[in-house]
Amino acid sequence: MIRIQAVNKKNELEKNITHERLKAEWEGYKWFWVDFDQPTEEETAELDKTFHFHPLAIEDCVVKLQRPKMDYYEDYSFFVTHSLNHINEDKQEINFFIGSNYIVSYHHELSKEMNDVWERLSLSKKINKWDPYLVMYHIIDKIVDNYFPIVYQLEDRLSLIEDNPNDETMEELLEKLFDIRHHLLQIRYTVIPMRDLIYRVINSHRLKGVKERYEYFADIHDHLLKLTEMIDGNRELTTDIRDSYLSINSHQTNRVMRVLTVITTIFMPLTFIAGIYGMNFENMPELTWKYGYFETLFLMFIIALGMFWWFKKKGWFR
């Protein structure tokens, strides 16, 4: 679907303009916005037929999930941005062509950000303040704002792992921890390129519309910096929690091994004594002693008790 809104020379917004009318009255508009919303192949062909955009830029629109970037052409600029679905974190590409008096947006899937800004422009009572760069600002601002709920949700999940209110096992907690870390990494792969893109945008000498609204685009960059810090901070927190759990697990294992070591050590001399008297020699004087059995048991008991006292004194049972 191709939908069009245009502002005429009287600063009046005209809605639901047909593609044919736009081509016929091109010069009669102050500026216009053409949105290629889930376009067909025939509609995509209009990027070349009507607007004569560069083949490489058109190819970037058709081929999904290019890296966020900005390219300059003779009389327009091309942008690739990425939005994230806050429910399933699916990545969606939204492209822009911006000229002196138009913005052309292109996206393969339904875009909530695009629809929100489209509706905002439709209902605006200050049309004279709008232009293609303000449209782009609002769309990118919406895209970036929608990153935050995803990161906040992961932060909440991380807090639950820290508190462990359901007394889950360490294996379950570590599995959830690695899942959160994976999601943070995926979001980072989106946020970092977008941050670099906006940095290029606000420092560009060719985008006059951005210079006029520098504070707005700089604010988006600040949000992306904040997101980067939040993501990196949470990734470090996942590492700290993982290390803490592994340290606790290692400590518990060491305590078990210490107890087993004490038991084994205590039984070593007892096993040695039992082994001696278990040998099948005929001439063993102790075997003929009247109280040899009880004396041997007493000796083994004293040895075990003495070793137990020694280990306890050394703090092995703490």
Predicted regions and their residues:
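Hydrophobic alpha-helical transmembrane segments and their immediately adjacent juxtamembrane loops
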Residues: 52, 222-318
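Peripheral, non-transmembrane regulatory/ligand-interaction domains of membrane transport proteins
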Residues: 1-210, 216-219, 223-230, 316-318
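Non-transmembrane, extramembrane segments of multi-pass ion/lipid transporters
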Residues: 167-168, 211, 236, 271
